Amino acid sequence: NEARKHNIWIVAGTIPIASKKVDKVYSCCIVFNNFGDIVSSYNKIHLFDVNIVETNEKYRESDYFLDGDSIAYVDTPFCRIGLAVCYDLRFPELFRRLSSQNIDLVCMPAAFTSFTGKAHWEHLIKARAIENLIYFASSAQGGYHVSGRETYGHSMIVNPWGETLDIIKNKSGVIISTIDINSQKNLRKNFPCLDHKKL
């Protein structure tokens, strides 16, 4: 309803969607067009099964979730958007696959832990944007949870040169930036590293 009401496209966060296994669900990111129709969805591929020794945190997403097996992107009236979710950010191969589909922008909902976010969040987003010459928009959950877990926040928009266009650190809010597709095309033409890759 909100997409239709405000005439906007929405890349929603993740919701649990039934999978082929009765006891597990997919962590699914859904895209709505400005008419409120679901036009794309992506099942998170990389599940967060880690031990963070420094903070005594343990996560086992694979206990509850089934991993997805395919990339997802969608054509919009303004650009081609690729989808990723949270821990996917640590796997450059996913973004290279998306890049091979000529995406212009990655949209990624996330909930990095406070510890890993402080160390890696901005570096990884900028690296993925630079190495694929893409815009990157990530909505990031931040703050304390009832369980005591703390997430890092820092929703941000980064351009293909790795510059932060807008950021909101650790609170609710909205960030807005202009995506300049012509500038991106010129950058890809003048700095054609994607055409130079050998492996």
Language model regions located:
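CN hydrolase (nitrilase-like) catalytic-core segments centered on the catalytic cysteine
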Residues: 1-11, 80, 86-175
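Short Pro/Gly-enriched beta-strand edge/turn motifs at strand-loop
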Residues: 10-17, 51-58, 136-140
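Short beta-strand scaffold segments in enzyme catalytic cores
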Residues: 12, 28-31, 72-74, 155-157, ...
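Short glycine/acidic-enriched loop and turn motifs that connect beta-strands
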Residues: 17-20, 144
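Active-site catalytic loop in hydrolytic enzyme cores
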Residues: 20-101, 114-118, 123, 189-193
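Short helix-loop capping/hinge motifs at secondary-structure junctions, enriched
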Residues: 37-40, 163-165, 184-186
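Active-site/binding-pocket entry motifs
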Residues: 47-48, 143, 183
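A short C-terminal boundary segment appended to hydrolase-like catalytic domains
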Residues: 182-199
